[in-house]
Amino acid sequence: MNITKHPLVSIIVPTLNEETTIPELAASLGRLRGDFEVIVCDGGSADATVEMARQCGLRVIEAPRGRGPQMNAGARLAIGETLLFLHADTRLPENALEFIAGALADERACGGNFSLIFGGDTREARALTRIYPFLRLGGMLYGDSAIFARRDVFDRLGGYREYPIFEDCDLYQRMRRMGRFVRLNACATASSRRFEGRFIRTFALWSLMQVLYWLGVNPNLLNRLYKPLR
């Protein structure tokens, strides 16, 4: 893994009970080309996530639970010029850092994200891979897509708002006001695990939450509605 003392990109990974994904995550990060650092931000895992990450040579910090607080904690310690927020079950292409550098060569660009395909030979994965391009065209954005941002832009925005859900959509909306948000054609590979065995119900529920969010319903209220139903 080409982790250096002066990385161009800081890869920030929020985790909670991800012991089964850590070895594959570490292996995929080891295939990246370029200078980077990795900060795993754990929100109090009850399994062996922290131990597994350290065994794989990853730097781990502890942070208040919640993706927003965890990613903000990682960003505060990051030293890269670019911040890349990566879910533990999302896999980047080997030349991901080259795509990011190309996007940010445009001085108007404030950051961006990757397109997505969903891994696994399942009906859920195939359906999500077909659906996602239309969601992206409609302005829907999720953290699975490996959002990246210039460090100075992220700092000026005050980082992630510490919402329990839709913290990624909120950051995207605010970043767009700061400059050009680059939607890369290059694909990251996300997991369809939360949809497996209950695709229609989960997709319908999440779509409803998305519509309510775009209508202006507060994410804290949406989370209270969402938690008992998921």
Language model segments and positions:
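Hydrophobic helical membrane-anchoring modules
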Residues: M1-T4, Q173-R230
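Acidic helix N-cap motif at the loop->helix transition within catalytic regions
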Residues: T20-E24, S45-C56, N95
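Short, acidic, metal-binding catalytic loop of nucleotide-sugar glycosyltransferases
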Residues: A27-F36
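A conserved acidic beta->alpha catalytic loop
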Residues: S28, D42-V50, T90
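Acidic donor-binding/catalytic loop of UDP-sugar-dependent glycosyltransferases
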Residues: A48, A88-G102, Q173
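Glycine-rich, basic loop-to-helix element that forms the pyrophosphate-binding segment
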Residues: E62-A78
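Short aromatic/hydrophobic "clamp" motif used to bind/position activated sugar donors
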Residues: L83
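Conserved donor NDP-sugar-binding/catalytic core segment of glycosyltransferases
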Residues: N95-R123
